[in-house]
Amino acid sequence: MRRKLRLGLALGSGSARGWAHIGVIRALEERGIRPDVVCGTSIGALVGAAYASGELDRLEKWVTGLAWTNVVRLMDLTWRGGLIRGTRLFTLFRTIFQDREISELPVPYGAIATELHSGRELWLRHGNVLEAVRASCAMPGLFTPVVRDGTVLVDGGLVNPVPVSMCRALGAELVVAVDLSWGKLGPYRQSKDRKVAPREVPGWLDRLRPNWFQGKTHAEGPSIPSIFDVFMTSLDIVEMRVARSRLAGEPADVLITPLLPDFATMDFHRAKEAIAEGRAAVERMGPLLAQVLG
């Protein structure tokens, strides 16, 4: 009788596109595929932690109920190391999810972060789950860095956007990876469904909005993106190139690539679309999944 190989699931970075990971996991479960190891980077660390702790249902219920106004209200402005402090968001997470240690999770789990001063890749395998997720999600310029054990940590997507290597180090013999960087670069588009009544927008955001968050549309020639979109797209380019390089040297056995080209960094209110595309991406890879995983 053939021994069942230990399966790892590597969930990549990708900001709001990361809700596609929920759809990927749901589609894999429907095929009877359940990972033995889960590793994530940035938003992948969040979804991976929810799965590893058995709380994916709670996360899915919360994200599918998000409106753009909810996203705006969770932004707590700071000018120290980033635009958003993140305290409000992660305080909310502590009310939604159980506060656990990584060692207590029923499924082996790890998150990737970057040590800011050295550029070193750090594997977070111990300590509080939400603190590890917060460090892995600390997107430079957007969220403030996290200080952990005397080191300053930022988003793991800078060094390892799709953590196949960590899955294998934790004992995975086969790895299914989800890369969210496919198809995300292209002509600038304004994000969908972002109309918010003035009274619902914090004063600080309303003051920043004209120059920082709103691009300019021209009748002739390409539209000019906002400062925020230029910065975030530049970060996307870096992470995409790093992901291609890492995956060439550390390939997954199955690579799943949700396509969400019109998703902006902060489109967290569009979870239903992302989840549906995550499911569709698994369906596209159905024959290979059957061949590799049996």
Segments predicted by a language model, with ranges:
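Patatin-like phospholipase
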Residues: 1-41, 49-294
